[in-house]
Amino acid sequence: ADAPRFAYRGMHLDVARHFFSVEEVKRYLDVMAIHKLNRFHWHLTDDQGWRIEIKKYPELTTVGSIRKKTMIRKEWDNYDNTPYGGYYTQDEIRDIVAYAADRAITVIPEIDLPGHMLSALTAYPELGCTGGPYEVWGRWGVADDVLCPGQEKTFEFLEDVLDEVVGLFPSELIHIGGDECPKVRWEKCPRCQARIRQLGLRDKDG
């Protein structure tokens, strides 16, 4: 019998670094369906661009979706000096989710946090420890600037964003990243240090 061995059969697509149009995403889903894959992990945000419309925070896409330039290969001082961007409206998200469902594919969105957030910080610099200025990254690597957990507005922002995301995706799973979050800003941020003391933690690592 032609039956899958694994219940979770997924593929990942990073549209934060390299934007894919709606039609390109649908072709990707078609290829997944041919191979009977059923989970589409959609990496929608990163330092290099914010790709999902959040109505409560419009500058995430008007500002955070566009980087001024992109590094060429891994030549650290060589950039193309060409603005690059793109994002999906909420209607486009719904269209893609429905298209995937018609092919027995569940879409699992990823909003990467608390690191990999330069695109959001560029749009809303008050969410960072230093207050900026920040810039949507045009290079690779791991940025020191991340969300500031020492202020309540950061958590309000995350709750608002995730509320809208949950409303767009019927998936039982939402990916929130959690990777590569340097703590150098937290070490020097008075608000973060106050939060550490308030929670009774040993240090920035808990």
How would you label these PLM feature ranges?
Residues 1-175, 189, 196:
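Feature activates predominantly on carbohydrate-active enzymes
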Residues 113-115, 179-184:
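Short, internal active-site loops enriched in acidic
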Residues 189-191, 197-206:
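C-terminal active-site-proximal or functional interface alpha/beta core segments in diverse enzymes
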